Amino acid sequence: MIAFTLLLSFLVALVAAKPTTCTKGAHVIVARGSLEPQGPGAMGELAEKVLKLVPGSDIESLVYPALYNEYLESQPVGVRTLTSVIQAYVKNCPKTQLVLMGYSQGAHVIMDTICGASSTGFPATLPQPSFVTDKISSVILLGDPSLTEGQTFHVGTSVGSGMFPRNLPAGCDSIAKKTVSVCDKGDPFCEAGGKDLSVHLGYIPVWGDYVVKESVRLAKAFIKKAKAC
């Protein structure tokens, strides 16, 4: 616990020290999966493709522990950090769109931040206000443990819910039309009872082109709408 507290203090200092630079394209925030080193992780490959296809964009890697054994402590830290990051960015850069991309625990962090945390075992939080969600052009998720059966933005072959389904899935309604949450059958995290870890680790080559295309489509639609206003 002492080591975790020291790590948390270090991460908070890193976040606080980072200046804000507004972009004309999209500000892409990437939340890595469990046990990946600090940075964008596997999702970074897809984020870089979005940057190339949406001119004037930049990328930010969410600074949070991404621990596995301490998941119940690590994930809420990510939620608190991402909440601070996106609210500060929207206030400082109100004309810039946000693209959120998360893998595994990172996907869970993003959805709890935006939808409000309502899964059993995690501290409850409220959904983000409209001044934040209105600036989000797309949310791209791979292997989200909080995926809940019936959510319209699910794509893939999985059945049922993830390990940590939402008790209040309606909190995601504000971003449902701009979210893509990929989960395939056998993934032990986004499909509770799944037993094939290779499915969870294999989304980039299978779904990468699709989610990049969707993110870019939504980003360009956001820019077009902003210019029309």
Label the predicted regions:
Residues 20-97, 182-212, 219:
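Active-site catalytic motif of lipid deacylating hydrolases and related acyltransferases
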Residues 151-229:
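C-terminal catalytic-base region of ester-bond hydrolases, centering on the histidine
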Residues 12, 23, 54, 95, ...:
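Short, well-ordered coil/turn elements that cap or connect secondary structure elements
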Residues 1-20, 228-229:
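Fungal secretory targeting signals
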Residues 27, 137-140, 178-180:
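Structural motif
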Residues 6, 71, 128:
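Generic anion/oxyanion-binding catalytic loop in active/binding sites
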Residues 82-173:
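Serine-dependent carboxylesterase/thioesterase catalytic core
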